[in-house]
Design a protein with these regions (language model features):
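Left-handed beta-helix
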Residues: 2-378
Length: 378
């Protein structure tokens, strides 16, 4: 947005006045330096007065390590890129500005510019060693720089706004997973602020982190309005799970014990299951959803210790229920005589180092990652 307190991305051209050599690269200019460099943060064409003509600066996402090492050995300035004094904040009541020495790592791009004996054309700009990756801002960052005051309906740069961005991303991912769900804001920003989000969905990043991977582990189902799903697990096989209430899955060893391992970690297989309970107490005025501080009336909770497993298929988990599976055990839950609400629970020993199943990953034909479920011991 125009006037936002953040940097922008620009194409930089530097000229050696002696040799007339030029250097080109895409880099970052912090918002505190715009006036100094004669840059006016103006709105983009046909965008009204809100959207800036410049792409917003975020972070360095991809970097060639070899080039960075070579740059650091050739110039000590590269070790402290983008040095500046930020005098934008008043530190005393009389308005006295306080100085903050900053080092913006985005400006490491300044050390990776392309040398040219003459002026480059616009066509050449596409072949620079630095580039900008465009995506939705909320995919990369959502800053919470101020506390929302009572009655304030603006979500920009507040914890409430950042949490909504998180849920908007979750909504996009759930659609990729073919899971029906309500709108994250429950229909409007006003309803979101007054009664909470339309749903809450959170997963451990180790489940992917790529959405393409997550969409192969979570396939089909639905989240009813005001439902909650929290999946602190990496090894999950979810298929056609319908949640109306709260479903909480927690592993003590999400990625193994001590070291990264997809063997010595908890895993859950949940297929054709209905979760039905009262879930979150949405009427509780003390709920603070963005900080995960809220009360529940009921929930279906699963805790997996160590390499424990749970296997649920063709069942309905109704009301307040909890399953805690110890290390080295597998809990199998099935319906009895076709009655989804009448359940049988069977504990089995896990062969050390041999889980029931695991995901096998391989690159596909389009450099995508394909994951196949491999049954090891059933």
């Amino acid at each position: 947005a125009v006037g936002a307190s953040e940097g922008i991305n620009v194409l930089v051209e530097k000229t050696n006045q002696v040799t007339k050599e030029r250097w080109y690269g895409v880099s970052n200019v912090e918002y505190t330096e715009l006036d100094k460099l004669g840059i006016s943060d103006e709105p983009a064409e046909n965008s009204g007065a809100e959207e800036s003509a410049y792409p917003a600066n975020t972070n360095v996402l991809y970097v060639g390590l070899k080039h960075i090492r070579d740059t650091l050995t050739s110039s000590p300035r590269a070790a402290f890129p983008g040095m500046l004094i930020n005098l934008s904040k008043a530190v005393k009541k009389d308005g006295t500005k306080g100085g903050r020495l900053e080092c913006s790592m985005q400006n490491i791009a300044d050390a990776l510019m392309r040398k040219s004996p003459g002026k480059l054309t616009k066509k050449d700009w596409m072949n620079l060693p630095t580039f900008v990756l465009f995506t939705l801002r909320r995919r990369v960052t959502s800053s919470a720089k101020r506390q929302r005051k009572p009655g304030d309906k603006s979500l920009a740069q507040t914890p409430d706004g950042s949490f909504l961005d998180l849920l908007l991303n979750a909504s996009d991912m759930l659609s990729k997973c073919s899971i029906e769900h309500p709108p994250p804001d429950d229909g409007s920003a006003e309803r979101y602020l007054n009664t909470g989000p339309g749903f809450i969905f959170a997963i451990h990043p180790a489940m992917g982190p790529l959405w393409d991977i997550i969409a192969q582990k979570i396939r089909g189902g639905s989240l009813a309005r005001k439902s909650e799903v929290k999946l602190e697990i990496a090894e999950l096989n979810w298929e056609n799970v319908r949640v109306d209430g709260s479903l909480l899955i927690t592993c003590t060893n999400v990625t193994g014990e001590g070291t990264m391992s997809d063997i010595d970690c908890g895993r859950a297989r949940i297929v054709d299951v209905d979760v039905l309970n009262a879930g979150i107490d949405w009427e509780n005025e003390g709920n603070v959803y963005w900080s995960a501080m809220y009360s529940r009336d009921e929930s279906a909770e699963i805790v997996l210790h160590g390499n424990a497993e749970i296997d649920i298929e063709g069942c309905a988990l109704r009301g307040n229920c909890a399953y805690e599976v110890p290390n080295g055990k597998r809990l199998v839950i099935r319906s009895v005589n076709g009655d989804a609400g009448c359940l049988s629970e069977t504990y089995e020993d896990i062969v050390p180092g041999v889980p029931s199943w695991r995901w096998k990953y391989a690159f596909g034909g389009k450099d995508d990652i394909q994951s196949d479920l491999v049954k090891l011991h059933l």
